[in-house]
């Protein structure tokens, strides 16, 4: 039995063993509520009986014996045996003279006598691949100076704040022309260039893929072996702290991809950690993920839940990360996800819901909320599971936001169509509004949509090259006007032709080509308009924030709508044409008399801000069911945004 039985909490923090772990630590870990367990397990510089060295602790309840191995003892499994800590399943050892920067692993002897060399699950630093050892490190002592950002974060309501996310894979965003570590930018180098780019473009947040340590580049960081270790591809933990700190000082938030759904079977990782299933479900019908060939975390074990929940807090509190995007939530919620009939285990009610995963999410999100960190929890959930962003006390899962996968699929299907056929698929662009306020949504055009022969965003568009760019500008304008926060993957803001490849840099030379430069400038202007006008983000989850003007002009494939702010006085009007036919005198209905001034127009040629200055006084003439209207020369593939004066 690997789960600690429920007992009464110790009256005092009595020291046991070497004295670094108390009875209360043990109790809380067994209950799954030791949210600072990473300060106890793992490797920590300590002084014991007057001698400086390293304290090691690991949870391995099925082990026959455990030792610490490393460069400091010639990797001899018998050189530094660890002692069991009562009946907790925890082993500990103090080794004098071991300092920082030492390679180490745990040598775990199974009940069958086999020795497994495992990386430390709680290691904060790891060897650069193909090495698999953990590295002793102290993450304390970094001098943060982002206090103003952190204080604002605690008070802000992200649901009513602007959020335009730039999704980035650091290893392929840019590369240096140097042999060290395959030309990867370091965290410190990337901080400066990335912050400059993001700030200039108008993004509010960066979402980073693949920061937790992972052995295989091709997994993009979604098969993690070091949950507590920022990947050594780009530097040390404190250099990653520098990265976060620097972006915060520039007013840019940081979101990390986080993977509590599954983990790989690599020999040094969590799989069969002590010779038996420990972090994973023992029954392969629950513990094996058939689609990915990975292991599934056992959400019924308190110690496993503790490992994950403490890890979420670790990134948010120790590294000042502003949010976690939880990968593949659907695979956790459904017991039959990716499994054929007869190869999954129903819950106690005979259903396919994973009750343990549901409880885990509610616990996780309640803890993040309860610690008043101000951090966001974002669910990549691809089904219609209800209440993903509702609080647990209302029966929800407690996430801050949910990726709007339904909108993304409909939007891309529509945009890929030849313009002639769009009129037969008009509902693909209007349907999303029917459920836009059912959750707190993020509209995503992520890395998943520009790989595996799906084409880059620009190459999804129909027509000749110029038409592709005009289409994409119109599409991006529709996205910016639609309720929901925004996310775009790197390279898609300047029209990268190639699909994303994690092995090579983006084709930055394209950003100097006229059509690409024009697209990049237009998307940047969209982002700055987005940040400037609260109508585009204040009421994303409120029906009062959106009004169709004309959702039914399918024959001409034109959409018009209004976005409102909380005052109802600083509204924006969007008019978007998804055909190559210009409408020289397109009449738009509006609810109020006044002047409508153009603030952004994509045009059909190269975009120049202010080139198409236009304002019109609405007339008392019914149109689109509205009492007033005005006419506007709407170009082919034209997108226009007006403000009301």
Spans of model-derived segments:
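Short, flexible loop/turn elements at secondary-structure junctions
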Residues: 60-62, 86, 97, 169-174, ...
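Short catalytic/ligand-binding loop motif for oxyanion handling, primarily in non-cytosolic enzymes
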Residues: 114-116, 174-176, 214-217, 262-265, ...
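Carbohydrate-interacting/catalytic domains
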Residues: 1-162, 187-198, 202, 466-469, ...
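Short glycine-biased active-site loop of nucleotidyltransferases that positions the nucleotide triphosphate
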Residues: 83, 216-221, 265-272, 389-390, ...
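Conserved alpha/beta catalytic core and glycan-binding cleft of carbohydrate-active enzymes
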Residues: 320-322, 340-503, 510, 531-588, ...
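Substrate-binding/active-site clefts of carbohydrate-active enzymes
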Residues: 127, 147-160, 169-353, 632
């Amino acid at each position: 039995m690997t789960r600690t039985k429920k007992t009464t909490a110790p009256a005092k923090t009595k020291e046991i063993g070497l004295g670094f772990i108390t009875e209360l630590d043990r109790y809380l870990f067994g209950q799954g509520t030791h949210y600072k367990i990473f300060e106890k397990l793992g490797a920590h510089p300590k002084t014991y009986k007057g001698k400086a060295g390293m304290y090691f602790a690991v949870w391995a309840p099925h082990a026959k014996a455990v030792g610490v191995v490393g460069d400091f003892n010639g990797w001899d499994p018998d050189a530094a045996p660890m002692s069991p800590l009562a009946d907790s399943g925890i082993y500990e050892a103090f080794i004098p003279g071991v300092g920082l920067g030492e390679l180490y692993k745990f040598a775990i002897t199974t009940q069958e006598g086999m020795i497994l060399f495992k990386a430390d699950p709680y290691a904060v630093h790891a060897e650069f691949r193909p090495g698999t050892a953990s590295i002793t490190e102290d993450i304390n002592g970094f001098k943060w100076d982002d206090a103003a950002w952190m204080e604002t974060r605690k008070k802000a309501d992200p649901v009513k704040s602007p959020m335009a996310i730039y999704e980035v894979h650091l290893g392929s965003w840019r590369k240096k022309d140097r042999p060290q570590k395959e030309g990867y930018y370091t965290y410190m180098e990337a901080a400066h260039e990335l912050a400059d780019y993001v700030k200039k473009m108008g993004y509010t947040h960066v979402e980073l893929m693949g920061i937790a340590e992972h052995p295989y580049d091709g997994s993009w960081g979604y098969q993690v072996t070091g949950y507590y270790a920022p990947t050594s591809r780009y530097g040390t933990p404190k250099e990653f702290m520098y990265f976060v700190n620097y972006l915060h000082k520039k007013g840019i938030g940081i979101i990390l991809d986080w993977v509590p759904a599954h983990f790989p079977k690599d020999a040094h990782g969590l799989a069969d950690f002590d010779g038996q299933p420990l972090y994973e479900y023992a029954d392969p019908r629950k513990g094996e993920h058939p689609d990915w060939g990975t292991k599934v975390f056992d959400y019924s074990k308190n110690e496993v839940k503790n490992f994950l929940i403490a890890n979420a807090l670790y990134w948010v509190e120790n590294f000042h990360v502003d949010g976690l995007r939880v990968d593949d939530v659907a695979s956790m919620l459904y017991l039959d996800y990716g499994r054929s009939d007869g190869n999954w285990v129903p819950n106690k009610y005979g259903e396919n819901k994973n009750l343990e995963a549901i409880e885990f999410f509610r616990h996780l999100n309640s803890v993040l909320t309860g610690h008043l960190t101000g951090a966001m929890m974002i669910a990549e959930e691809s089904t219609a599971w209800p209440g993903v962003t509702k609080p647990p006390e209302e029966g929800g899962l407690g996430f801050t936001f949910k990726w709007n996968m339904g909108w993304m699929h409909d939007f891309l299907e529509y945009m890929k169509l030849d313009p002639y056929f769009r009129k037969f698929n008009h509902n693909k662009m209007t349907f999303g509004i029917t459920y836009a306020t059912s959750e707190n949504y993020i509209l995503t055009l992520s890395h998943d949509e520009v790989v595996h022969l799906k084409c880059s965003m620009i190459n999804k568009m129909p027509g000749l090259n110029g038409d592709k760019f005009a289409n994409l500008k119109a599409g991006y304008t529709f996205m910016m006007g639609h309720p929901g926060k925004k996310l775009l993957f790197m390279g898609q803001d300047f029209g990268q032709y190639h699909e994303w490849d994690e092995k090579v840099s983006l084709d930055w030379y394209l950003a100097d080509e006229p059509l690409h430069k024009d697209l990049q400038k237009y998307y940047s202007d969209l982002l700055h308009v987005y940040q400037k006008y609260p109508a585009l983000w204040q009421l994303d989850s409120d029906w009062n924030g959106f009004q169709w003007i004309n959702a039914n002009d399918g024959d001409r494939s034109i959409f018009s709508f209004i976005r409102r702010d909380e005052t109802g006085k600083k509204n924006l009007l969007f008019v978007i044409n998804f055909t190559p036919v210009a409408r020289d005198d397109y009449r738009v209905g509006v609810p109020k008399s006044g002047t409508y001034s153009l603030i952004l127009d994509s045009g059909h040629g190269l975009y120049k801000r202010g080139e198409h200055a236009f304002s019109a006084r609405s007339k008392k003439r019914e149109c689109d069911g509205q009492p007033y209207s005005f006419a506007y020369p709407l170009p082919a593939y034209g997108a226009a945004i007006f403000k009301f004066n």
